[in-house]
């Protein structure tokens, strides 16, 4: 929604933190136009990503090995992580950057460490209150709800203990989503469905793992377009051929990975590569 809001003059400035928007978002060409129009683009990151290269102001931050904090997970768990190495260069922790910006803009934020920030968060969220830094010391792991700061409350392993759900009758509610038709239909010009996926050896947009020599060595060539062998035969495409992949939004070049594994009528591309960026098509 942000690119549309920028084009409609509803957003004048955009602050991006730890995200390579020009790599991960659909319809990258529309995002590029929005970034060219926005009056101020600020990017806070640890690497010079494609988005960072377009920033008016670049705020260099520390990596996870250069600062401490708390990780949260999908299993409701909290775990502390610790600084492993001292940062080099003109970089600052994310919380330091945000605090200094807020203070400069008239909203004072004065913290001395991450514990003070975490304690403030706990004070505002009752189900986190008992997840203290002391309980998470070392390899400590706390799952919310954890409402008591005392040592006897070590969190909640099972959220709905006794199969009692947070509803008046104590039972879970199942419901189906309404079906929505596809935004675009197949056509004679575009007969295949493209799905964007992730490279097995890389995480998210590859800005971190792509800077790891060991992982980069596993896949040092830009990604492939995976397609069904029957579709490839009908199009005269052989395995490892360089091919153009086109949609109504643009076209990119990549190498064909032909196999029986891919469903007929479908093709797949990883969105993490700078060359052959499939999100120029989506």
At which residue positions do the language-model features occur?
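A cross-kingdom feature strongest in bacterial/archaeal respiratory oxidoreductases
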Residues: 1-88, 122-282
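Non-catalytic, well-ordered alpha-helical segments in soluble enzyme domains
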Residues: 94-112
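Short catalytic/ligand-gating loop segments at beta-alpha or beta-beta junctions
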Residues: 112-118
């Amino acid at each position: 929604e942000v690119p549309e809001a920028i084009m409609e003059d509803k957003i004048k400035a955009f602050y991006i933190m730890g995200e390579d928007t020009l790599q991960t978002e659909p319809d990258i060409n529309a995002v590029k136009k929005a970034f060219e129009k926005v009056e101020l683009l600020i990017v806070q990151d640890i690497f010079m990503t494609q988005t960072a290269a377009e920033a008016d102001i670049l705020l260099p931050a520390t990596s996870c090995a250069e600062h401490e904090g708390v990780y949260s997970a999908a299993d409701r768990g909290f775990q502390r992580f610790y600084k492993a190495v001292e940062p080099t260069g003109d970089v600052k922790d994310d919380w330091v950057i945000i605090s200094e910006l807020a203070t400069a803009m008239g909203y004072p934020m004065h913290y001395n460490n991450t514990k003070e920030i975490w304690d403030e968060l706990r004070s505002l969220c009752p189900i986190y209150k008992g997840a203290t830094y002391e309980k998470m010391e070392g390899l400590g792991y706390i799952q919310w709800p954890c409402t008591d700061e005392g040592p006897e409350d070590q969190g909640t392993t099972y959220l709905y203990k006794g199969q009692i759900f947070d509803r008046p009758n104590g039972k879970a509610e199942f419901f189906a989503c309404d079906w929505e038709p596809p935004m675009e239909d197949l056509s004679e010009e575009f007969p295949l469905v493209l799905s964007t996926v992730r490279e097995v050896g890389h995480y998210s947009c590859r800005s971190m793992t792509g800077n790891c020599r060991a992982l980069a060595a596993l896949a040092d060539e830009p990604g492939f377009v995976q397609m069904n062998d029957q579709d490839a035969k009908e199009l005269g495409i052989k395995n490892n051929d360089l091919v153009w992949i086109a949609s109504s939004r643009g076209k990119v070049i990549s190498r064909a990975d032909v196999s029986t594994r891919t469903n007929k009528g479908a093709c797949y591309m990883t969105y993490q590569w700078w060359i052959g960026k499939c999100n120029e098509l989506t």
